[in-house]
């Protein structure tokens, strides 16, 4: 996949109607946005276009309304908040069919530097099927397309891929440009030693990531629930910990592949365990083995030290997935230790979206990282070496 894409700075935007696909899939409570990270992420691109006299038409999905106009998925609160953040009115085109009379009228009346937000693209069933009709309707509003929604770049939808068939040039905004720079450099030309840290509950979610990263990294660190499947593959006892029995063979293959490639594969050497899946006081094991009746819920202190040491020596670090049950105060220590080691590392540090991003932000280490990806699923597919349709559809430099 070519990561060298045209950006908003490579095209003339003044006086042009520009359709911008943003990621405004934000959490709402009683009509109020509870996490503005994604709105903040979209600001540099929107501001650049406004300041350079473009007519800015924003579009996004939110949640899963499944092709119905459900009011709880309306982007009206987003338009209101964007108006406050930009210090100028963002006109909301409240069409249940997304590109309707309101949208057409609002766009026709735009002056340079004006901003319009369309209704939730997933109000239309064909959005997620990459249907021709909606793609054409979206394209008909504008003279060029900007994709700045990395979070949906792994989806071939009307507003990410279909629209580019009918609307050229198609370029990336600052957010996607930054994602491509950090993730692209890491998987293509990392500064070494290159360390990847994978956590989270399931091996099955990360099969292709493990396989692909073993071709690229110097050290692979595994924590979280998926570590127990690997430990079982090595012959350790894991008590009643989460194990994917059908992935034990696969874990054996990956351990062999790491050895063959000369990759250090680090697994926990001790654990924090409990008798049930609850936030109770942790028992720390002596070694890799977990006794009958206990389940591993976090990595142990010896493991923390080993992982922190590997991170400290690295020049590039990518992390995806917590080391334990981060929601439980007694079992968030491993995740905190990894976040802290990354914050202190003299390296390019990349957080691959999802739970790790939330953890790093909650712990207050966000500004210490080189890059926090805005796409959980998209960054995982990127690390799998897959082509992301939303990126592939943009014009190369």
From Swiss-Prot:
Task: Give the binding site residues for substrate.
Answer: 23-25, 38, 61-64, 122, 155
Question: Could you state a single Gene Ontology molecular function term?
Answer: phosphoglycerate kinase activity
Which positions does UniProt annotate for ATP binding? 206, 296, 327, 353-356
Give the enzyme's EC designation: 2.7.2.3
Q: Which reaction does it catalyse?
A: (2R)-3-phosphoglycerate + ATP = (2R)-3-phospho-glyceroyl phosphate + ADP
- Report the enzyme's class at the first EC level: transferase
Q: Where in or outside the cell is it found?
A: Cytoplasm
Q: Keywords for this entry?
A: ATP-binding, Cytoplasm, Glycolysis, Kinase, Nucleotide-binding, Transferase
Subunit text: Monomer.
What protein name applies here?
Answer: Phosphoglycerate kinase
Lineage, highest ranks first: Bacteria, Bacillati, Bacillota, Clostridia, Eubacteriales
The gene behind this protein is: pgk
